[in-house]
Design a protein with these regions (language model features):
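Glycine-rich phosphate-binding loop of actin/hexokinase-like ATP-binding domains
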Residues: 203-241
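Nucleotide/phosphate-binding catalytic cleft detector across ATP-hydrolyzing
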Residues: 1-16, 20-75, 80-206, 224-226, ...
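Active-site core segments that coordinate phosphate-bearing ligands/cofactors
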Residues: 244
Length: 244
């Protein structure tokens, strides 16, 4: 993708779908080309419950944004957050025996974590991997300790996964809309990047998002989302309970 190619993002929701088209200019500034907020149908807590209704709603949202921007998207980024999301943390260890740490050492630990995750639950698909700690001889490194001499290396990471069938249904909706999903993005992660500054993301922060049908909690540290959970309880449930 070229620097100035239009980029599309759609955020799934219970009430509305939000679509944004923008581009990154040569001076690295972003320019919004169009936005669209349209009614959501066939989607509950970002899970597709009716393929036909969801396809029609998403087609309308993307089409409205494309018409405003006077362009046609081939790919789009999808922002969503399901109560079925799983957050799994791993700490993998490797002996270095006084040698330098190389990139392939870190890649080995990452592959080992992914392998264990898949063995534990083959029905999950990975949408995010966050590297948040490297521990070299008992000392914490915030960045990759490439070329550092060490006896041991531990790599701490967090995986965000979603049930494969949930993902298949989302993919099918966008296939029916004749558009390819470029990337799947956690809504909690996007909120953290938007609302928290670098210091807050580095030192540690908690973010709670009260939605209409769900509540999401994200814990951030070392510039990573280290824990995330979404509950199928929202402001709608709270309001209904109070009114009784």
């Amino acid at each position: 993708m070229n620097l100035e190619d239009p980029i599309g993002i759609i955020e799934l929701g219970n009430v509305n779908l939000k679509c944004l088209i923008f581009q990154i200019n040569k001076n690295n500034s972003s320019e919004i080309l169009s936005t669209a907020i349209t009614p959501s149908e066939g989607i509950h807590n970002d899970v597709v419950v009716n393929l036909t209704k969801a396809s029609n709603a998403i087609r309308l949202s993307i089409g409205t944004a494309e018409k405003k921007a006077k362009i046609s998207l081939k790919k789009i980024n999808v922002v969503f957050e399901q109560p079925d999301f799983l957050c799994t943390k791993f700490s993998k260890h490797k002996k270095i025996d006084g040698s330098k740490i190389h990139r392939h050492d870190i890649e080995f630990l990452l592959k080992e974590a992914k392998k264990q995750l898949i063995l534990n639950d083959k029905n999950q698909s990975i949408i995010h991997i966050f590297n948040h700690n490297y521990i070299v001889d008992g000392k914490i490194f915030m960045e990759e300790p490439i070329d550092v001499f060490a006896d041991s290396l531990s790599h701490e990471m967090t995986f965000i996964t979603v049930p494969k069938n949930n993902l298949k249904n989302i993919n099918q909706v966008f296939i029916d809309c004749d558009i390819e999903i470029e990337r799947l993005i956690s809504h909690t992660f996007t909120l953290g990047v938007k609302l928290l500054n670098v210091r807050e993301l580095q030192l540690g922060s908690a973010l709670i998002n009260l939605g209409y049908k769900k509540i999401s909690l994200g814990l951030f540290k070392n510039l990573a989302l280290v824990h995330s959970v979404t509950l199928p309880i929202g402001t709608d449930h709270i309001t209904n309970d109070i009114s009784k």
